[in-house]
From Swiss-Prot:
Entry's Gene Ontology cellular component terms: cytoplasm
Cofactor note: Binds 1 pyridoxal phosphate per subunit.
Subcellular location: Cytoplasm
Protein residues bound to L-glutamate: R43
Statement: the UniProt record of this protein carries the keyword Amino-acid biosynthesis: yes
Protein name (record): Phosphoserine aminotransferase
Organism: Xylella fastidiosa (strain 9a5c)
Amino acid sequence: MTMRIFNFSPGPATLPEPVLRQAQDEMLEWNAVGASVMEISHRTVEFMELAKGIESDLRCLLGVPDDYAVLFLSGGATTQQALLPLNFAAPGQTADYVVTGHWSKTALKQASPYVNINVVADGERGGFQHIPSRAGWRLSKDAAYVHMTANETIHGVEFRQTPDVGDVPLFADFSSSIAADLIDVSKYDLIYAGAQKNLGPVGICVVIVRRTLLERTGQPRADIFTYASHAERDSMLNTPPTFNWYLLGLTVKWMLAEGGVQEFARRNQAKAQLVYQTIDQSGGFYRNGVAAAVRSRMNIPFFLPNVEQDARFAAEAKAAGLLSLKGHKALGGIRASLYNAMPLAGVQALVAFMHDFQQRYG
């Protein structure tokens, strides 16, 4: 019998076992159509009904208002980062970017060929261990939008409140924290999220955008790069990643059945607290320097006394059935990703291993 390990990968990430088992059961034939869902046309009545149901479920899960369009697009968050200025910034216009870690820097880089960038706040001087106070942000007078990254998977910092940016549209990358805690969607004008952390497999991205924004002219671009065109065609302007869409739908249904975002917020707080307590009570053997008020509940980086210990920890953890704990190459150390599908038992196993490792090598 195949053994399932605890997978702490930052993405592609662990998927709920019930979702995997249902997909396994339906692999050869889905919905009595005589074929797999990945084999049928996205234009069939069956798949179009599936797509509508998934959108309805996602709206229910996240509380998406009716005046927002919900798009399911091929690719991931990086693609959206390049499309934002093309769709919503006029030539020569400025966009404001809040830099809180590696991925907000990536968003800025992807947008920079198409819009003038104003960095309103930059946490790099502090080693990305805090989020600069809103009072010190240098917002532009006529910015096309303000962009933020809700959770930084590498440096482990997270916005706990939605920043007030006035009348300027607020855009947010929620790839690693969507559905992890309750948010008021109406406080954002556009949310995008690659699915491979909390929503499903890699290869599909959700975009939630205020419909009035779709009226902006933006810059010259093809239809395939135009959000309004995708909205008009119900995310079927081109052939979508149907199997990924289906798996996303199963994951959303699973989250609803488990109690919705409110329940996962409770679980995620409890899981993260276990790990942070172990770090903070280790007497410095494990270190996490992120300011307590902005510590991520999804991604927890930490360091041992030296790089040799980091490597030994990751190797022994893997042998113990705790997978993908090696930190990102940009930062090093160890990183535990605790997305919605990570069960409490996995975190308890990690914490037990941390205690054992410290006893043996501390």
